[in-house]
């Protein structure tokens, strides 16, 4: 074939290469995307996916992926132009660079919404994506793992289809590969699958916990983030899964050490996992306590602020809820002051709610537990948030429940006195019941109660409260001589002055 004949073909090929590469480069900068879209670039790139030159196919796919990644509108354009089907057809070719770019397109489309992810699945992409997990090239495996992850994350139906495509075993094998980027992608995708429900978490746990838990001690921050989140997403669904995770971790110290990590997200995800573990059974809570967990958790909530504290605070509450000795371990770890700090100083109401929940469970077991909590002056704070009209409904509920739990075991009457003057009727009932329980026959407490204004307060409110509360006040009054009760009554001074006035008038006559 003469040079004159070949030259136009060579120039045409060079032009296609230049065009596809230039568009891929332009699409890497967000400020160019709208102009490219307006120029109809998607329709021009589509035929290049079937080009005979592999580098052109690859550049075209990369450009389409970058365009789809930019917006949902462009991702929908990829679906509407039937580009996904074309990519799936081309995946049968052995070009690893094109396979990586095609997986990137699937990820870029699927990430925007469940509907677009479903379009990718309905186009038949799952089987070739799972096959890409078995490719020799780790970058192809990584791209496929991310695409499967972005499909799985939206809902349980899509994640179930990924599981049914036999992706889980291949993803677990990817975790065992030496490439760190591939490990990260596999761990994140398994986490997306496991997050939805127990049925999806179970195959991940059955086949992968030995491998997954090994990486708790791995020296890579992003991987540890993903692993802690993955373990939490497995654990959260049931006590059985939590037990499986604990059995495979073997030494809880490995997980607790993640709370000491230099990276805040590792710490947050580890706290999430621990929170889900201790919530599921007293045995799990005991294992964490035996490994020194309360002290490490307290250090965690001391040194971190904002939302990550939530999981640590809830963990202390869950541990304390099960048994009195576990609650005492939380007290001995000096948790109460940090819980009080969260209640008083955290700006987020859901964290205040968690602090109320934890303090309520710490203080509910016995008079000793209650005293430790009430001595920290948290009862007044809880009552304040319960009565504050700006508090959320959840904060009010948690504060009310915690107050009742702690007060019902409180023998430290001096800590109840400040509440007596401001407590609403439903809390006042619990306070009065404690006075009835501990004042009777205790002359020291009776004197203190009278001298500190408590007895006088009861006389002031006696006629303003409902009959049930009047009965309780009457029972407390019965512990004192009648003249003492009369002395602290609101009308006593007026009655006395009337007597004086009456006596003076008689003398003048």
Model-derived features with residue positions:
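Alpha-solenoid helical repeat architecture
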Residues: 8-11, 49-52, 91-94, 133-136, ...
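Short helix-loop boundary/capping segments at the starts of domains
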Residues: 25-38, 42, 47-54, 66-73, ...
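Residue-level signal for cytosolic alpha-helical hairpin/rod architecture
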Residues: 1-3, 20, 30, 42, ...
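Buried hydrophobic core positions in alpha-solenoid tandem helical repeats
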Residues: 2-5, 44-46, 86-88, 128-130, ...
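Short, hydrophobic/charged alpha-helical patches characteristic of ARM/HEAT alpha-solenoid repeats
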Residues: 7-10, 14, 32-39, 56, ...
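Alpha-helical solenoid repeat architecture
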Residues: 17-30, 44-47, 58-70, 89, ...
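N-terminal "cap/leader" segments of large eukaryotic alpha-helical scaffolds
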Residues: 1-35, 47, 485-509
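Alpha-solenoid helical-repeat scaffold
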Residues: 331, 349, 356, 362-509
